[in-house]
């Protein structure tokens, strides 16, 4: 990121990106609610070539007890990339990046979850990245929201997430791995559409003030598309495609 020299054509003269998409076209997204019988809630997402499984457990007692909060519940998130999720086998031990993304996702989810409804307890979110292809934090955040809803955790809204970015001096939606590595900017955004609130906003790269505003708008519009797929996943599980 940050304007590194590209080794491939990221955008051709017709405005087509390296994977054939237009500037405002997301990758293929498939979300499924449920699937893990031993979890209180779960979900599976394919976001481009990302494949991520999420399990939610709780609310349940906090151990050790002194870590509990008498006024509110605790949300705990673990983001983990399987050793086979990337081309070169990854060390199975938690990396600094995994710890950082766990914290980012936790903080993006907290405004959505009504933790005050279950004091002295914890909700654990386990995120397993089975295959990675750029944008895993957005895909994981999206899937985690569905899994929390599937678990019946009280929520103000679901958080939908996608990344906007800048490639070949053009603002784009849904940055893939090649664009992330060789593009000019990457902006992951998490958004609660019903409340019109952003819960995640990061920027890697350099943007002008105008590009910054455009990236946010493109990202928010993309989150609204993702949100419809989140709702569909829950509707498909609980209502069998009946209704909206």
Swiss-Prot record:
Tell me the GO molecular function terms. 3'-5'-RNA exonuclease activity; RNA binding
What protein family is recorded?
Answer: Belongs to the RNase PH family. Rrp41 subfamily.
User: A single Pfam family, by name?
Assistant: RNase_PH_C
Organism equals: Nitrosopumilus maritimus (strain SCM1)
Q: Which InterPro entries match?
A: ExoRNase_PH_dom1, ExoRNase_PH_dom2, ExoRNase_PH_dom2_sf, PNPase/RNase_PH_dom_sf, Ribosomal_Su5_D2-typ_SF, RNase_PH, Rrp41
Would you name any one GO CC term?
cytoplasmic exosome (RNase complex)
Subunit info?
A: Component of the archaeal exosome complex. Forms a hexameric ring-like arrangement composed of 3 Rrp41-Rrp42 heterodimers. The hexameric ring associates with a trimer of Rrp4 and/or Csl4 subunits.
Which top-level group of life is the source organism from?
A: Archaea
CDD domains, A to Z: RNase_PH_archRRP41
Q: What is its EC number?
A: 3.1.13.-
Task: State the name under which the record lists this protein.
Answer: Exosome complex component Rrp41
């Amino acid at each position: 990121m940050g304007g590194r020299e590209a080794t491939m054509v990221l955008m051709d003269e017709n405005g087509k990106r390296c994977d054939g998409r237009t500037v405002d076209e997301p990758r293929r997204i498939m979300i499924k609610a449920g699937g893990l019988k031993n979890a209180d809630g779960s979900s599976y997402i394919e976001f481009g070539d990302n494949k991520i499984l999420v399990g939610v457990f709780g609310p349940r007692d906090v151990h050790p007890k002194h870590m509990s909060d008498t006024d509110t519940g605790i949300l705990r998130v673990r983001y983990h990339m399987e050793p086979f999720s990337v081309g070169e086998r990854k060390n199975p031990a938690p990396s600094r990046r995994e710890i950082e993304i766990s914290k980012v996702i936790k903080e993006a989810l907290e405004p959505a979850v009504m933790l005050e409804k279950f004091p002295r307890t914890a909700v654990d979110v386990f995120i397993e990245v089975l295959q990675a292809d750029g944008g895993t934090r957005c895909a994981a955040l999206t899937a985690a929201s569905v899994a929390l809803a599937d678990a019946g955790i009280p929520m103000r809204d679901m958080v939908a997430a996608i990344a906007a970015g800048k490639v070949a001096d053009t603002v784009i939606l849904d940055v893939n791995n090649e664009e992330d590595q060789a593009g000019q900017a990457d902006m992951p955004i998490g958004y609660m559409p019903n409340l019109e609130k952003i819960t995640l906003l990061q920027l890697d790269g350099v943007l002008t003030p105008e590009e910054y505003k455009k990236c946010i708008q493109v990202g928010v519009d993309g989150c609204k598309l993702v949100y419809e797929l989140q709702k569909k996943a829950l509707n498909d599980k609980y209502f069998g495609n009946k209704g909206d």
